């Protein structure tokens, strides 16, 4: 029997990461209102948001593994999701350039068959290049940073402005593949169980 693998996210980057590792997930966007959750601890916040997204979708299906994720970038003790405007993105990039931040991705994996749930957080240190005002304006004008937690896409144009990472590369894109493998193993599965 094949167990459905359901991604509780509309993120094309997360879907692509799963497909790269051989899993072609069923995509179900949770439409969860993130403003309902007000926590100051970044790890608790991303894990709670990931859990809420996964639970919304889990309540809509009868079987399968449901993966919810949420990412935030913390720079100088301030947590950032997606910027709300180009102006906000420019201000953020002015703070980020030549600086470093920590990208947190909460992972919630619900196994409907076993009635089990796991919560984890991937943590990656990101070092940003000292980019010019012109580079910031051009990058923001591309529209890419407005779609991403932390205001950059490592797998896109934003990768040009990241000097180095300490930790999991895929975590910065929105899903830690090594962490997911560990979570699957903890539930008694292997990644190969979900290969297409």
UniProtKB/Swiss-Prot annotation:
Write down the required cofactor(s): a divalent metal cation
Listed under GO cellular component are: cytoplasm
* Catalytic activities: a ribonucleoside 5'-triphosphate + H2O = a ribonucleoside 5'-phosphate + diphosphate + H(+); a 2'-deoxyribonucleoside 5'-triphosphate + H2O = a 2'-deoxyribonucleoside 5'-phosphate + diphosphate + H(+)
Subcellular location(s): the record lists: Cytoplasm
Q: Which residues form the active site?
A: 70 (proton acceptor)
According to the record, the signal peptide region is none
UniProt entry keywords in alphabetical sequence: Cytoplasm, Hydrolase, Nucleotide metabolism
What's the superkingdom here?
Answer: Bacteria
Q: What class of enzyme is it?
A: hydrolase
A Pfam entry, by short name = Maf
The main place the protein resides is cytoplasm
Protein's GO biological process: nucleotide metabolic process
Q: Which InterPro entries match?
A: ITPase-like_fam, Maf-like
Picking any one GO molecular function of the record gives: nucleoside triphosphate diphosphatase activity
Question: Which E.C. number(s) belong to this protein?
Answer: 3.6.1.9
Role of this protein: Nucleoside triphosphate pyrophosphatase. May have a dual role in cell division arrest and in preventing the incorporation of modified nucleotides into cellular nucleic acids.
- Give the UniProt family note: Belongs to the Maf family.
Name of this chain's protein: Nucleoside triphosphate pyrophosphatase
- Organism this protein belongs to: Gloeothece citriformis (strain PCC 7424) (Cyanothece sp. (strain PCC 7424))
